[in-house]
Structure formats: C-alpha cells, structure tokens
Amino acid sequence: MKKFLLKPKKSLGQNFILSSEITKKIVALAGSLENFNVIEIGPGYGALTREILVHNPKSLLSIEKDRDLVKHHDQLLNEHQGKYRIIEADALHVTEEELIERPVKVIANLPYNISVVLFLKWLNNIKFFTNLTLMFQKEVADRITARPNSKDYGSLSVLSQLLCDIKKEFDIEPKEFFPRPKIHSSVITVNPLPIPKFAVNLETLTRLTRAVFSQRRKMLRNSLQNITNHTETVLENAKLSGNERPENLTIEQFCLLANNVECLFCKSPIAI
C-alpha cells in the first residue's frame, strides 16, 4: 500500500486505516444502514467507504478536503452511480442539511486536526443525526466519555453527555494506520437524545464550563469570579459551597449552576 499512496498531508491530519477488520467493526457499530443516508468525513483512499457501501445505505456522501484524494474515488463513483457521491469541501464549513436528507448517520475516521471542532459543530445541531460512529485520537475520546472526578472530565464531557448517550467501543493501535501516528485512536458511538438530560441554555453552559475548566485546579468560588459579580448568590442558589473544583460537579450540577448564572435577577433560584 505504501508504494502507491500519495504522501499523506500532515496539515490535513491524514492517517489511513490499513485493516479491513477494523473498518468492518466500525461500520457494524452503526447498525443497519438500509433506508439511511450516510455521511463520511475524510474518506481518504476509500477503505471505510467501501465497507459502508457493502451495507447498502440509501445513499453515501463523502466529504474530502484533499483534491488529490477526491480523484481516487472515480472507480467507486462508477460502481455505485446514484448511491455514492463525493464532494471536495471542508467539513467544518458545510451545512449538512443542504447536502443530504434525514435520516442521517455519520461514520467517520475523523482527521485529528479538526476532530474536536467538528464534533462541537455537530453537537450544536445534534437532532439532525440518527447516530454517529466516530474515530478520534484516544485522548479526545477519553475526554468525551469522561465521568466526574476524573482528570479527563471537562467542558467537552459535559456538553457531549448532556445531549447524547455515548459509549467508547474499542481502541486502535498506531500500527493499524499509514502513516503510523504517535498516538492511539478510539472509536465511540454517539446516540442523540430526544431532549437534553437537563434543561439549560447551551450557550451559557458552554461559556461557564469552558471558563471554570480553564482553571480546573481552582475552587469553584474563585473560577466563577471571571463569569459573574454575584458569585455567592449563584453558589447558594445552586446549592454549592464554592469549595468544589470543576471536576467534582455532575452534569446536573453544571446545568443548575448555568441556569442561575443566567438568571441572576430572578426572585427565586432556578431548579432543574
């Protein structure tokens, strides 16, 4: 394979899957693809693309930023006319609703350099998707799936798990890719919830969690001072002492805190 591959572009975070066994495991996690439209990001040379097409989706749309790699999909396009299409585009800047109809599943080996930003973009429109089966660098997957009182728990964990049921499925060693990355990868499954687990303004929650986790070793009372001039009132209404550190709070507690930050001038505290 190394003999005919174009030189992978580090600037695009390209690492291609070598194992067909891994592509089979990934696609199987997405469940039945019949009657579903599928989006793939960064198809590369088409290893995952081919496995998706084996499962007979209603349609498959691949989004590839590298023009040189788009050209390598001519054979797949000919073999699956009317079912498969590929566009040259940056996944960060496309509007999925304009490109494909629901119901939609996403199956992707995400480019390392855009994986977090792209996932956050999808979270902001999560109801558009039926489910997502995604490969991340292991460190990011650990952050997404982390629980309170762990070193990986942070803003990404809170936002992801508020909106979705998420499961880390398996890890992948560097030897399974070309070029071989220095880090391990992990596959997670993401199932959007009909409604968030707790009622909250997502913009306020995002601002809050990013602010306090940027100072994760500080007690909550100190880190909240960058967000509100009414720290003690907010803490009292949220039933917190202020001595907690951000990693100690559950998602429910963060939502209660965000609600009270947003409603400083309410006559009574906001409950969930």
Swiss-Prot record:
Task: From the UniProt record, list the reaction(s) this protein catalyses.
Answer: adenosine(1518)/adenosine(1519) in 16S rRNA + 4 S-adenosyl-L-methionine = N(6)-dimethyladenosine(1518)/N(6)-dimethyladenosine(1519) in 16S rRNA + 4 S-adenosyl-L-homocysteine + 4 H(+)
- Keywords on this record? Cytoplasm, Methyltransferase, RNA-binding, rRNA processing, S-adenosyl-L-methionine, Transferase
Q: Which residues form the signal peptide?
A: none
Where does this polypeptide localize? Cytoplasm
Q: Gene Ontology terms, cellular component aspect?
A: cytosol
Write down the Gene3D superfamilies for this protein, in alphabetical order.
Answer: Ribosomal RNA adenine dimethylase-like, domain 2, Vaccinia Virus protein VP39
Specify whether RNA-binding is a keyword of the entry.
yes
Write one Gene Ontology MF term. 16S rRNA (adenine(1518)-N(6)/adenine(1519)-N(6))-dimethyltransferase activity
Q: What class of enzyme is it?
A: transferase
Report the superkingdom from the record.
Bacteria
Q: Which Pfam families match?
A: RrnaAD
Q: Which InterPro entries does the entry mention?
A: KsgA/Erm, rRNA_Ade_diMease-like_C, rRNA_Ade_Mease_Trfase_CS, rRNA_Ade_methylase_Trfase_N, rRNA_adenine_dimethylase, SAM-dependent_MTases_sf
Chief place where the protein resides: cytoplasm
Which positions in this protein are listed as binding S-adenosyl-L-methionine?
N15, I17, G42, E64, D90, N109
Q: What is its EC number?
A: 2.1.1.182
The record's function comment reads: Specifically dimethylates two adjacent adenosines (A1518 and A1519) in the loop of a conserved hairpin near the 3'-end of 16S rRNA in the 30S particle. May play a critical role in biogenesis of 30S subunits.
Q: What's the protein called, per UniProt?
A: Ribosomal RNA small subunit methyltransferase A
Q: Please name the source species.
A: Wolbachia sp. subsp. Drosophila simulans (strain wRi)
Q: Gene that codes for this?
A: rsmA
